[in-house]
Each structure stands twice: as structure tokens, then as C-alpha cells.
Amino acid sequence: MIPNAQDTRVLGSEIADLKVPAVIPNTDYENEAKPAYYNDTATPMHQRMEALVLDLQDRLVVALESLEPSRKFIRDRWEREDGNGYGISCVLQDGEVYEKAGVNVSVIEGTLAPGQLRSMRERNPQTANKLNANEEYDFRVAGVSVVVHPRNPYAPTAHKNYRRFEVYRKSNKEAGPVLAWFGGGADLTPAYLFEDDVKYFHQTLKQACDAHDPQYYPRFKQWCDTYFTNIHRDETRGVGGIFFDDLEDKAPEELFHFAYDAGSAFIKAYVPLVAKRMTMPYTLRERNWQLIRRGHYAEFNLVYDRGTKFGLMTPGARIESILMSLPLTARWEYMNQPEPGSPEAHLLEAVRTTTDWAK
């Protein structure tokens, strides 16, 4: 059970020395110069996507580190044993601001396993029309995946993922991809609801979407609400954001620019929220509730998340990177039920209803 509201034992001694920087780097992507790869149409798209995800990783790590006084991200570069790709895992654990944060890049290729091919064909009729169930296919994917679990219960957890996936006929890879799409999104998972924070997060993502298609935000917001649902609990994982997959409705160049803007907008949408909440005092009550909500977060990632399941089905996959999204600590209490009218109950109302946060 959540400790009594009268429990005022203050935790989080680390907040006493935390200072919010006057300027958080890399949060003004609209006015920053575009990198060389942005308009480099002479370079193959898969190489430009690799450059994009590495750039997004670097810029987000710098922004997150600007708030953390005691630790830096560990950069762990790894190579697949079969030589078909690499990754860079940037991880920070046991910091004063971040209990666990991971910003991972993976650039890999291989052969689609039968289960992966079947899953792709079942979820999308257009994919089923382009991929023969009896044929072998190779794939190439470059992506960046982010999960941040702050220490302070009032600072929200957040997730971001952007990737490009290409599929080739194994018998004729030189002909180019028979299928290619972009996927990704960003979403917010608070333990305590600050409506202004949620509105700011959604509005920032909406601005990035609107710059490319006014239908993107409402479409991807609804998709996010549907996808990030713990069906067994009848609640969403958090308060949403945007989510899309199998996106090929525009020219690859335009979709690449959208991925750049949406991926960059996450830094602006999220890191200032951590800065805003990381110095708030909290007690054992708030800490325990945060851990309970993290338990629900872990349930979604292990039971429903498509990326986690795809990774676990991939031969030679790096399990440490796949499970990076799990929180460092979590809590499961038998028959936990917040008191009516409490801040915890207010959060549950938000994850059990649909709200237009961007209006």
C-alpha cells in the first residue's frame, strides 16, 4: 500500500546540490544549422539514417548530462559476433538526477527469421503483398532508442525511438530494397501528473509534426495511445505522445526530414521537464508510487513492446541493449489501490482516459 499521506520523511538528499543550468544545450533545433547529411541526397539513405541516429544520440547525451552533476554517460561500442553491424550504448546509472538512462544506437543487418517475416506480414497488409512468405529476405536497420528514468518521482520517465528499416530479397540484394519504412515516436510516463508539463510535451511534438503534415500529430497521437496500452490493466503506459510504424506515405527524403525534426524535438520537449522537477522534495510515499508505476512500465515492455520482442527473436542480438529500457528498480504490491482524490489516483484517471493534451 502507498504510505500514509502523513509520512513526511524527506528522501532525496541529492536535490540539495542540484542546479538547473541557465541554458540546456540542443533544445533549439529549429534555429540551429542543419548537419551536412540533412540534404546529402548523393549518399544512400541507409548511410544518412546512420548519421542521423548517431547525431541524435550525441545531442541528447549532451543535453541530459547538462543536468547531472555527478556522472557521465558510459559509451559502450559493441560489434555483432557475425560482423553484420554494431551499436553504441550510452548508459548512465545511479546518478543524482537519473537513476537509469540509456541512449542506444544500433546499425545492423541480417536475414529475417521466419517468425519476424510472419509478424511483419500479419501486422500490415501492404507488407504482406510485397513479401512472399516462401522467400528469404535480408534486412538493414539503423535506429536510436532512448529511455530515461529520473530519480525524482516528480520528474517523468520518457522514451524515444526512431529508425529506418529496409528489406531486400536475399537472392538479389543489389537491386535495392523491396520495402523500406520509417518508424518511431516519443512518449511520456509520469508517476505524478503535472498537466502543464504534459501539454508542453505534446505541443512541442505537435509543432514538429505540423511542419510536415497537419494530419501527422492527431494520427500518431491516437496510434500512441493505442499502442502503449497495458491491456491486462486497462490503462495506457503513460500520457502518450506520438507513435508510428511502417511509414512510407511520402517520399523518403521528406520522411527523413520528418524523422530529423521529430527526433530533435524530443530534446526540447523532455529535458526541460526534468530540469523543472528534479529539485522538488519528495518522501517515501512518492518514491514507492514511482516504483509501482515503473513495475507497470516493465510489464508493457516485456509483454507487448514490438521492438523488444523483435530483438529477442533476432539471432545474435545483444540482450543488454534490448533490455536497457527496463528501470533499475521497480515494485509490485498486492492489490495496490490509491486513495480516492489523491495525487496517485489523479494519475490513474489520466492513464485510463483519452485527453487532447495539445489543444
What is each residue range found by the language model?
Residues 40-129, 247, 252-283, 287-297, ...:
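Gly/Pro-rich turn-and-neighbor structural signature
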Residues 198-284, 288:
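Extended, acidic-biased charged interface segments
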Residues 160-167, 174-191, 312-329, 333-334:
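Intrinsically disordered, low-complexity regulatory segments enriched in Ser/Thr/Pro
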Residues 100-102, 138-142, 179-189, 234-254, ...:
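Glycine-rich, often proline-containing surface loops adjacent to acidic residues and nearby aromatics
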Residues 169-219, 359:
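Compact, glycine/acidic-enriched structural inserts
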Residues 87-184:
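Internal mixed beta-strand/loop scaffold within catalytic domains of large alpha/beta enzymes
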Residues 2-35:
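N-terminal regions that are enriched for targeting/export leaders
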Residues 10, 308, 314-359:
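TerminUS-proximal long segments
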